[in-house]
Design a protein with these regions (language model features):
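Residue(s) in the substrate-gating loop at a strand-loop-helix junction
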Residues: 576
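Active-site helix of classical SDR
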Residues: 555, 592, 600
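C-terminal substrate-recognition "lid" of short-chain dehydrogenase/reductases
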Residues: 513, 654-681, 686
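Alpha-helical segment proximal to the catalytic Tyr-Lys
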Residues: 560, 605-606
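Catalytic Tyr-X3-Lys loop
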Residues: 525, 536-552, 572, 596, ...
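Glycine-rich flexible loops
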Residues: 1-440, 452
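Short, small/polar-rich loop/turn modules that mediate ligand/substrate recognition or access, typified
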Residues: 608, 613, 673-677
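Conserved mid-core segment of classical short-chain dehydrogenase/reductases
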Residues: 526-541, 564, 585-588
């Protein structure tokens, strides 16, 4: 492992933080980010770092403090505030206590913060405080786990690190672990040995130093030694050169899994969870190992990963060329997995004589030979984190198997972390948004009504695929979203008149989110002309392709996924007032939109047996790009109106905005008992009232 600490980078980094940030905190931030941006060291909020210094208080003068990573911070992006200052001496005084409960410990941490609004310090703060070094770094490096997740981990680590090793047998994070580490460190010094690294059995690595550089460099050195040992232990494996064939289309497996989990209640929301597939060469090669199922059933590489991946994955076995039986097979194996989890929960509660609130029993990681790793989460972030963690778990498992035998923490120890009192306290239900868990695909999403609808669906909690034929518009639309919405959005370029491009857009949705639930088929054009003219007939043909046939391309592709998921779905079409009350010289548009209205109704009839709803929004006179290039002026002139008067010519005398139309689509997306319906969004037009 290469060090990424560069002396030349430090001063500019500190200058960017500003003079108000103490130098020691700036240095702490610099090396914390170096650790956090290397996934072979820590992943997604894992690990923690600290630095000890002095702060000036208006009341107490100089106060010794420890800057320690706060809960919710990610080392990769941590800011100075992510290391809140805590009074050091009161924490060290806690060593005199024989024991301390988790909530009592957290209370001590919070009451000793210098800033009451700061994040809660890490649960491993006391371990950092009890060690004498100025800087302390804690990581869960893959290579370290490969050597300490062993039956003889201590012996292996002593061969690697010699007298510099402080070995600490497994203890769950908290007060007891802090005490044990401090005692082991002091005993090492008392024996006349110089501590270099602390390895926590089946947990991870602690390094330390008087400077940020020294502590960081010790991490890199310790991990490099471990990597070298794993490499020297690697077995020679003869690969066939080809991977196992997928039992069926990977997309079918993804859709069927998502639908199964939705049906069984595997998602915290009513819709299916987000499913992300990883099919790297490393993942597929691991799944081809004859012992892959056994290895994956052993447990998490480090205890806190259980909070993201459950104790074990589901190793899914599917028959080849049995597409009809895929969903039934997946459902049976998911039910079996849940039964095993329920038994584990009951066994652990009984053996420990504790009462806990049971978490859902559904898998977060599903392994399918020939298909890959399927990670499950309530959100894309959750699924991505689980996938990242398990990809690195595979590296740890294979490294540990090369070194000796993969032997991480026991099921009993995993249960203690999974059902930790501090985690149980977080189970208060938060109010979900109307479309939480839903995946929506919106066409024509680069501007106008489509863009507004995508934004509204995201606001309501959905994950959204934005589709448009203009890449620049899509990029701008996504960049304009807030951070929360942007994390649940993806985009892809497609011309919806091209069925192959439409299929590719839906494949993108499957790769990004695992499937789709809601389709807003919005893309279209607004050609004008007389049908009895040669130009009008040509425009009619073009309009039928763009405003009718293209919508069927979208609906057909959606229906394939809806049927494979088996959980219903929602088709929404942007029709138009022109479908029921055509205007003069607007035939190419009105005829195609009338056909689209009939298309919506036909899908309402034909798709109902699959639980699929089909509805439409009839909007009128919304000032979007369709009214550009003189169209608005021409339509207003036909009626003898100014452009502004034209857009307000309705019963309410109110201009209809794209957000108004988006609100109608959002309502229909959640209207579970409504199909074959038209909602008008036109400010009121008696001639266009649905009959």
């Amino acid at each position: 492992m290469q060090s990424r600490y560069h002396d030349a980078d430090v001063s500019p980094f500190l200058q960017r933080l500003g003079a108000e940030v103490p130098e020691i905190l700036g240095l702490r931030t610099y090396t914390a980010r170096l650790l956090g941006t290397d996934p072979a060291l820590v992943l997604h909020g894992g690990g923690n770092t600290s630095a000890k210094g002095t702060l000036q208080s208006r009341v107490h003068g100089a106060v010794d403090v420890i800057y320690v990573k706060g809960s919710g911070s990610d080392l990769a992006t941590i800011e100075p505030r992510g290391h809140p200052a805590v009074r050091l001496q009161p924490l060290r005084d806690l060593r005199t206590l024989p024991s301390m409960g988790d909530f009592e410990m957290v209370n001590e941490l919070r009451t000793n913060l210098l800033d009451a609004s700061a994040p809660t310090p890490s649960v491993e703060t006391l371990l950092h405080a009890f060690l004498p070094a100025r800087f302390v770094d804690h990581t869960h490096a893959d290579a370290i786990l490969a050597i300490c997740d062993q039956p003889d981990g201590e012996e292996i680590c002593r061969r690697i690190y010699g007298d510099g090793l402080v070995w600490v047998p497994y203890v769950m994070p908290g007060f007891a672990l802090a005490q044990r580490c401090a005692e082991a460190f002091e005993a090492h010094v008392a024996a006349g040995r110089r501590p270099e690294v602390i390895v926590l059995e089946r947990h991870g690595l602690f390094t330390f130093g008087e400077t940020a550089k020294e502590s960081y460099s010790r991490t890199i050195s310790a991990v490099s030694w471990a990597e070298g040992y794993v490499a020297e232990s690697r077995h020679t494996v003869v690969l066939s050169g080809t991977r196992s064939e997928a039992p069926c289309k990977p997309s079918l497996v993804t859709h069927a899994l998502r639908g199964t989990l939705a049906k069984l209640g595997g998602s915290p929301c009513a819709r299916g969870p987000i499913v992300q597939r990883r099919a790297t060469e490393t993942v597929l090669a691991f799944l081809d190992r004859p012992d892959a199922a056994d290895l994956s059933a052993i447990g998490s590489a480090t205890p806190d990963h259980v909070l993201r991946t459950k104790p074990t994955p589901l190793f899914l076995r599917l028959s080849k060329n049995d597409e009809r039986g895929v969903r039934a097979s997946i459902e049976a194996q998911v039910v079996e997995y849940a039964a095993r989890y329920d038994a584990y929960f009951e066994e652990m509660c009984a053996s420990k004589a504790v009462a806990r609130t049971k978490l859902d029993p559904w898998p977060r990681i599903v392994l399918v030979p020939g298909v890959g790793l399927l990670a499950v989460g309530q959100t894309l972030t959750d699924a991505s984190i689980a996938a990242d963690i398990y990809e690195h778990t595979i590296d740890v498992i294979e490294g540990a198997a090369d070194v000796g035998r993969y032997a991480p923490v026991s099921r009993s120890d995993l249960f203690d972390v999974e059902y930790w009192s501090l985690e149980q306290a977080k189970l208060k239900k938060s109010a979900g948004r109307p479309l939480s868990g839903a995946v929506a695909l919106v066409t024509g999403a680069g501007s106008g009504i489509g863009k507004a609808t995508a934004r509204r669906l995201l606001l309501d909690g959905a994950h959204v695929v934005l589709v448009d034929r203009a890449e620049e518009r899509l990029r701008d639309a996504v960049l304009g979203l807030d951070n929360d919405s942007r994390g649940r959005a993806t985009w892809t370029v497609a011309d919806v008149t091209n069925r192959t491009a439409v299929d590719a857009a839906f494949a993108h949705a499957t790769m990004a989110f695992g499937g789709v639930d809601v389709i807003v088929s919005n893309a279209g054009t607004a050609p004008s002309g007389d049908l009895h003219s040669e130009v009008g007939e040509r425009l009619l043909r073009e309009s039928l392709e763009q405003n009718l046939i293209a919508h069927n391309h979208v609906a057909r592709a959606a229906m394939t996924i809806f049927q494979e998921q088996g959980t219903g779905g929602c088709l929404l079409f942007n029709v138009s007032k022109a479908a029921v009350t055509p205007g003069p010289h607007f035939g190419p548009y009105a005829v195609a939109k009338a056909g689209l209205l009939a298309l919506m109704r036909q899908y309402a009839v034909d798709a109902a047996p699959f639980g699929v709803r089909s509805n439409a929004v009839n909007a009128d006179r919304v000032r979007t790009a369709l009214f550009g290039e003189g169209v608005a002026e021409a339509r207003a002139a036909v009626r003898g109106l100014t452009v502004d008067a034209y857009f307000k010519a309705n019963l309410l005398e109110r201009e209809v905005m794209d957000d108004d139309v988006a609100g109608a689509f959002a309502y229909l997306a959640g209207a579970r008992a409504t199909t074959g319906c038209i909602i008008t969004v036109d400010g009121g037009n008696p001639a266009a009232f649905p009959r």
